[in-house]
């Protein structure tokens, strides 16, 4: 009788465990395989999904600044910049930097990990200016009591940007190299011992759909997914410590197609879909599987070979420059918003 009861109790326990497993959301399962990062400056969304890390960019900062609830942050940033003695155009630029950091500080109150903050994209081809701006952003964070380990400075993956990040990493300033579209960029980042890279998935897919006139690719042939898998496998095969964070997703299928990647930065809209999805999620990438994959060998890289390979890769070349231009435009929009808010042009003319 006792053994019969024990058997029934065990059956009930196993049934309950299976039921719980069946109702686990895709997002919850993904978090067990990959570090999930919020690709957003939306504080409400970050608080809702509770990712470990968060990423921002000029477009996201500008969108957040346009919200009414950001008014106080903007006013505080402007006041601080003015008290520091900045005037005219320099006042606007300093306000943008302070505001960007202030958003980062607010985000860090909601997460346990790191926030990525981007350097002015107009500096993407200027190594020294990028270094100087990154140091300024780092110093601003320190002024708010934020440890360096909780910040990643985002820099575009140009040759000049990667060399700037190499210097910053040596100084103890961790970097996130963004707008990355090819293995040649990933190799340069590895050589520079960068903390983290952000290869873009969705933008690669968009480019190929337009270039090849294809409406959709099956996930196993998705050019963006395959690009990240190649980079991930190369890093694991070579024992490279730089973390790979897939970015710029167009669908949850792309996200789940890279389950197991070191990190994935995901927009709130897709996080919401994953939270409602109960499909089974399995690792698509792993260090062990990378060792079994086709071996990837790369020759030693120089500035000349990097630039030559970039120019030969039309997709990477166009998307890198297009991404830089887009981020510059977003920063210009934020500059205009601030000028209109504070009547800066009228003040300058006076």
Model-derived regions, located:
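Hydrophobic faces of well-ordered beta-strands that scaffold small-molecule active sites
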Residues: 34-39, 53-56, 113-119, 151-155, ...
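Active-site-adjacent beta->alpha loops and helix N-cap segments on the catalytic face
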Residues: 126-130, 155-167, 183-187
């Amino acid at each position: 009788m006792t053994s019969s009861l024990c058997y029934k109790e065990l059956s009930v326990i196993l049934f309950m465990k299976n039921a719980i497993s069946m109702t686990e959301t895709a997002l919850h399962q993904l978090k067990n395989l990959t570090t999930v990062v919020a690709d957003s400056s939306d504080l409400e969304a970050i608080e809702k999904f509770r990712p470990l890390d968060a990423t921002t960019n000029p477009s996201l900062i500008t969108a957040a600044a346009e919200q009414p609830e950001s008014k106080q942050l903007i006013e505080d940033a402007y006041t601080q910049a003015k008290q520091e003695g900045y005037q005219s155009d320099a006042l606007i630029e300093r306000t943008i930097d302070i505001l960007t950091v202030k958003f980062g500080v607010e985000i860090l109150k909601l997460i346990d990990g790191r926030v990525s903050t981007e350097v002015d994209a107009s500096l993407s081809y200027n190594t020294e200016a990028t270094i100087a701006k990154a140091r300024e952003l780092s110093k601003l964070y320190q002024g708010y009591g934020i440890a360096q380990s909780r910040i990643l400075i985002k820099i575009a993956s140009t040759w000049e940007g990667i060399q700037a990040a190499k210097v910053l990493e040596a100084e103890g300033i961790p970097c996130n190299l963004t707008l990355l579209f090819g293995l040649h960029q990933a190799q340069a980042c590895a050589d520079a011992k960068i903390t983290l890279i952000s290869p873009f998935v969705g933008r690669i897919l968009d480019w190929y759909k337009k270039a090849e006139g294809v409406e959709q690719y099956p996930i196993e042939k998705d050019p963006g997914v395959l690009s990240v898998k190649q980079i991930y496998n190369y890093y694991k095969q070579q024992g490279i410590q730089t973390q790979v964070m897939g970015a710029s997703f167009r669908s949850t299928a792309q996200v789940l197609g890279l389950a197991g990647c070191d990190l994935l930065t995901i927009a709130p809209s897709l996080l919401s879909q994953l939270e409602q999805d109960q499909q089974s999620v399995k690792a698509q990438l792993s260090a062990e599987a990378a060792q079994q994959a086709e071996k990837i060998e790369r020759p030693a890289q120089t500035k000349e070979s990097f630039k030559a390979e970039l120019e030969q890769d039309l997709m990477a070349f166009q998307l890198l420059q297009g991404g830089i231009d887009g981020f510059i435009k977003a920063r210009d929009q934020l500059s205009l918003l601030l000028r209109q808010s504070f009547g800066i042009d009228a003040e300058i003319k006076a």
